[in-house]
């Protein structure tokens, strides 16, 4: 039985940073065949329209198995770098799944990926790390950076990115334009101004 493979985006820093990191997370979800969920705090749930008709991208916080989701900080026990350092995830640099030690180990239920200004989980941007990350069901993405340009450097994503964005410099424009539309309460404030 194949479980869902999801990315849960966690808000961090100011609104502009949140928007840019959100579209980067969405792009990563597209490239890896994951469901993209947004863990918005209750006071920000109406900020943007739902981008997908008939469904929601909001994470149902009350049913989520990870406690204290907004209070994990930038380097919790399940952070990707800590899992690498403790050998709970092992990367051998080869694309052969049989040679990767994660095949013989139980895969963590979730990995916390911190791509904030401190760049705690830098190995994420190395292509050989995408194979073990692909085996994890839940990626909790804690980011305040627009990291979409860095995805272009990962060999496994380059062909798909070229197909999706023939003009590479249009990536942010197209993603922002598609994904982030102000919600009705925001439009109400804008029109009353």
Q: Which ranges hold each PLM region?
A:
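Secretory-pathway glycan-assembly enzymes, especially type II membrane glycosyltransferases
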Residues: 1-193
